[in-house]
Amino acid sequence: MTETFAFQAEINQLMSLIINTFYSNKEIFLRELISNSSDACDKIRYQSLTNQAVLGDESHLRIRVVPDKANKTLTVEDTGIGMTKAELVNNLGTIARSGTKAFMEALEAGGDMSMIGQFGVGFYSAYLVADRVTVVSKNNDDEAYTWESSAGGTFTVTPTPDCDLKRGTRIVLHLKEDQQEYLEERRLKDLIKKHSEFIGYDIELMVEKATEKEVTDEDEDEAAATKNEEGEEPKVEEVKDDAEEGEKKKKTKKVKEVTQEFVVQNKHKPLWTRDPKDVTKEEYAAFYKAISNDWEEPLSTKHFSVEGQLEFRAILFVPKRAPFDMFEPSKKRNNIKLYVRRVFIMDNCEDLCPEWLAFVRGVVDSEDLPLNISRENLQQNKILKVIRKNIVKKALELFEEIAENKEDYKKFYEQFGKNVKLGIHEDSANRKKLMELLRFHSSESGEDMTTLKDYVTRMKEGQKCIYYVTGDSKKKLETSPFIEQARRRGFEVLFMTEPIDEYVMQQVKDFEDKKFACLTKEGVHFEETEEEKKQREEEKTAYERLCKAMKDVLGDKVEKVVVSERLATSPCILVTSEFGWSAHMEQIMRNQALRDSSMSAYMMSKKTMEINPAHPIVKELKRRVEADENDKAVKDLVYLLFDTALLTSGFTLDDPTSYAERIHRMIKLGLSLDDEDNGNEEAEPAAAVPAEPVAGTSSMEQVD
């Protein structure tokens, strides 16, 4: 009995987009369908490693492409694992994959249709060339079913007990009138060679072969007799003597006979088994596209073999772009395909390379792993651990080779810089090598980025530390008050603008024996002359009373108030403890959906307020405190300085409303306006402005 189902909303939207929008590269549909067939063959082959019986009578795994000009259909058929009824319903219509929406967004943003395979929705590309698609599938665990849809928002599923499929899937495309070119033999051959040459299973194309054949008149007579049997009236002929007939020479003639047969289109042996010197760049690019579903060539390639006690061959590719879901925790990584003696085992072997290398694509073919190895055994397998170690080593070599070309490495770092940093955080064994791959903007690098090695070579005489600041953007950090004194002394400062930089700096303490120093934290000291040290001590003594008064006003909002060593032009800043979170890290943790509040309270240590004794505002505050410690304007000014310092130091205001009210009062005083409604002013934490408008105005104007 035929059942009708509605497409899931996002899938319906995707199909509508595919059908109603013009795309020039419609040819990719064949690549996607062949790729899906290859995956289906992979799955049944993997099952057969532990249970040979699953192959049954259909032990030859292959893919067939059959053009039918008479019926205007193109069929792609495989002997893979097939689909049950539930899988047909779910996989081809009612359950949207995670990539469906992402792919539509990519298309709307100007992306290429050929990206479709990367998002796991390649099947729907069939509707680029077909107005109706029929899928017949037979799985070992179910009877055969036929799925069919003309993309009108619904599809049907029908039991097909008399199906001739023993196991596998047959996809029949009923081609649109303007897409009949995909029935031409030459066109199909070119497409298979272009996109699917390195698929691991035979791709058999149904081709027509014309042969000339000599036939006798007897053959023609037989043919005529056959026609007669079909209803034609037989001709009356004179009966001749056999001997007389034999004496005559038999007449023959040549006729053209057209036959159909399947011809394998992908006869090349696996690329990784060949000598790298014999493989062209075009062949690597074609192979990469075949295994990755990418539409672009790879950025770089590493083809190598390891011999000795352990033997394996591998090809690693670095893509030009990062996949859209690279850091999704639920995403199953299928970056490197594992083969054992040319037999495909699996394509999502998470133990084959670490998470930070999730973007690397490729194949590994081991001579030593057992063919029937299970996922559970893989985790404990010593051979796999050695292979993993070698893959990481070769990947690092590949990155170093890319780094030799500045433009290529710029592309690489834009896409995969986060992965390098994740590697530093997670891979202690390779941390030193990975640090050499880091690039940062700095106060001296302009629009370019610098390496840590180059930074060290430019360090000033007497500079003992590698100075850095963390924040949201390069633009903000260039004007940060934290770097004022460092820049005045001619010290270069690294700008770290990605959230992952905070985690990286928790793991690294030095580079080439030069310690890292975060300018947003306590404990930063610059080399000073004896004269500078003497002046610093005098300032500490002179401003001790102001520091105490400011601490009394701010209470537990700050740990302490001290005279700053790092300020040059700003009046004050807020720094965090050496081992606590920086302002940038606080912001990152605030934005965590599942943050641990108790951990946040512990790590968000109290801040230290540093004041600049050379700044006019600070000097005036000092004068006021010394003249009258109970000056009511001082409290409001201290709070205003504190809130402003929170902002310039990268923190978030806990009470933006109070800050705004203080600013409004300042504006009123600047405009010589009376404060008509004291009731609207905040009671805490700032004190009210003094009652005498004239005196208050005078005081604020002096500060300004």
Curated annotation (Swiss-Prot):
<dbReference type="Pfam" id="PF13589">
    <property type="entry name" value="HATPase_c_3"/>
</dbReference>
<feature type="binding site">
    <location>
        <position position="123"/>
    </location>
    <ligand>
        <name>ATP</name>
    </ligand>
</feature>
<keyword id="KW-0963">Cytoplasm</keyword>
<comment type="subunit">
    <text>Homodimer.</text>
</comment>
<dbReference type="GO" id="GO:0140662">
    <property type="term" value="F:ATP-dependent protein folding chaperone"/>
</dbReference>
<feature type="region of interest" description="Disordered">
    <location>
        <begin position="675"/>
        <end position="704"/>
    </location>
</feature>
<feature type="binding site">
    <location>
        <position position="36"/>
    </location>
    <ligand>
        <name>ATP</name>
    </ligand>
</feature>
<feature type="compositionally biased region" description="Basic and acidic residues">
    <location>
        <begin position="227"/>
        <end position="238"/>
    </location>
</feature>
<dbReference type="GO" id="GO:0016887">
    <property type="term" value="F:ATP hydrolysis activity"/>
</dbReference>
<dbReference type="InterPro" id="IPR020568">
    <property type="entry name" value="Ribosomal_Su5_D2-typ_SF"/>
</dbReference>
<feature type="compositionally biased region" description="Low complexity">
    <location>
        <begin position="685"/>
        <end position="695"/>
    </location>
</feature>
<keyword id="KW-0547">Nucleotide-binding</keyword>
<keyword id="KW-0143">Chaperone</keyword>
<dbReference type="Pfam" id="PF00183">
    <property type="entry name" value="HSP90"/>
</dbReference>
<feature type="region of interest" description="Disordered">
    <location>
        <begin position="212"/>
        <end position="251"/>
    </location>
</feature>
<dbReference type="GO" id="GO:0005737">
    <property type="term" value="C:cytoplasm"/>
</dbReference>
<dbReference type="GO" id="GO:0005524">
    <property type="term" value="F:ATP binding"/>
</dbReference>
<dbReference type="InterPro" id="IPR019805">
    <property type="entry name" value="Heat_shock_protein_90_CS"/>
</dbReference>
<dbReference type="InterPro" id="IPR037196">
    <property type="entry name" value="HSP90_C"/>
</dbReference>
<feature type="compositionally biased region" description="Acidic residues">
    <location>
        <begin position="675"/>
        <end position="684"/>
    </location>
</feature>
<protein>
    <recommendedName>
        <fullName>Heat shock-like 85 kDa protein</fullName>
    </recommendedName>
</protein>
<feature type="binding site">
    <location>
        <position position="375"/>
    </location>
    <ligand>
        <name>ATP</name>
    </ligand>
</feature>
<keyword id="KW-0346">Stress response</keyword>
<comment type="similarity">
    <text>Belongs to the heat shock protein 90 family.</text>
</comment>
<dbReference type="InterPro" id="IPR036890">
    <property type="entry name" value="HATPase_C_sf"/>
</dbReference>
<keyword id="KW-0067">ATP-binding</keyword>
<dbReference type="InterPro" id="IPR020575">
    <property type="entry name" value="Hsp90_N"/>
</dbReference>
<comment type="function">
    <text>Molecular chaperone that promotes the maturation, structural maintenance and proper regulation of specific target proteins involved for instance in cell cycle control and signal transduction. Undergoes a functional cycle that is linked to its ATPase activity. This cycle probably induces conformational changes in the client proteins, thereby causing their activation. Interacts dynamically with various co-chaperones that modulate its substrate recognition, ATPase cycle and chaperone function.</text>
</comment>
<dbReference type="GO" id="GO:0051082">
    <property type="term" value="F:unfolded protein binding"/>
</dbReference>
<feature type="binding site">
    <location>
        <position position="78"/>
    </location>
    <ligand>
        <name>ATP</name>
    </ligand>
</feature>
<dbReference type="InterPro" id="IPR001404">
    <property type="entry name" value="Hsp90_fam"/>
</dbReference>
<feature type="short sequence motif" description="TPR repeat-binding">
    <location>
        <begin position="700"/>
        <end position="704"/>
    </location>
</feature>
